[in-house]
Amino acid sequence: MDYQRLTISGQAIVVAFDMCSSSNIIEDLTKSRNVQPLTTFYGGLKRYLAKEQKATAPFDPYKFTGDGWLLLFPANTDGARLLRFLENLCLYFAVEFRRSLLPHLSHRPALVGIRFGVDKGELIPLTMYGQQEYVGRAINVACRLQAAVMDRERRPTAYTALVSNRVYSEYFAETKPHRVVKVTRNLRNINGGAEFACRRLWLLRPYLSTDDAN
């Protein structure tokens, strides 16, 4: 199934996600000279995302980042559908990783899964080298949130998201994530170095108990 590009204008929800332990996984497969399972895995993930564009919520698969994607959702996306998309993606990844990638690794990575950063804001379209590109603070914030998901954790966990308070209040406040916690993070070059208040969402059970680190 082919993916569809979606034209984004004005406000948009930016979802950044990547694969945990990707550097170790790539190194493992490279050492064994067997990188085909990784390309096959990413090809399957691309097809899954194309299917979800029609089945769950339309979005623009804006950019592949080497170990994840930047996805752009229209501002009028339904919050329940957006949450379902994130949860379904976690389920797909967990099953497919165990089925098609893990058997080819020499050892199981310490942390398996995906992590997300989500923000909303104005995106400015531009053409660069003949390609549709976007600039906007929301892209920077979503990427920083994704990178900061596991900061301050005593025991890192995957299948979680850091979402800005704006995204939470506009899209997720009336939904039912498995678990939500108020947290703060220091995001590089965001908020002038001040603490950035956000929410952490657990998207796949089992999750950490309430007395574990935020």
Predicted feature residues:
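Acidic, metal/cofactor-coordinating or nucleic-acid-engaging core segments within structured domains
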Residues: 47-50, 81, 85-102, 154-160
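Short glycine-aspartate micro-motif
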Residues: 14-16, 113-115, 162
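Alpha-helix/helix-capping structural signal
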Residues: 20, 24, 121-123, 166
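Catalytic NTP-binding/metal-coordinating core of nucleotidyl cyclase/transferase enzymes
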Residues: 1-88
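Intrinsically disordered, glycine/charged-rich C-terminal tails and inter-domain linkers
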Residues: 1-4, 151-214
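Glycine-rich, phosphate-binding/catalytic loops in enzymes
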Residues: 31-34, 134-136, 179-180, 194
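A contiguous pocket-lining binding segment that forms or flanks enzyme active sites
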Residues: 138, 142-151
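Catalytic core of nucleotidyl cyclases, primarily class III adenylyl/guanylyl cyclases
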Residues: 53-81, 99-137
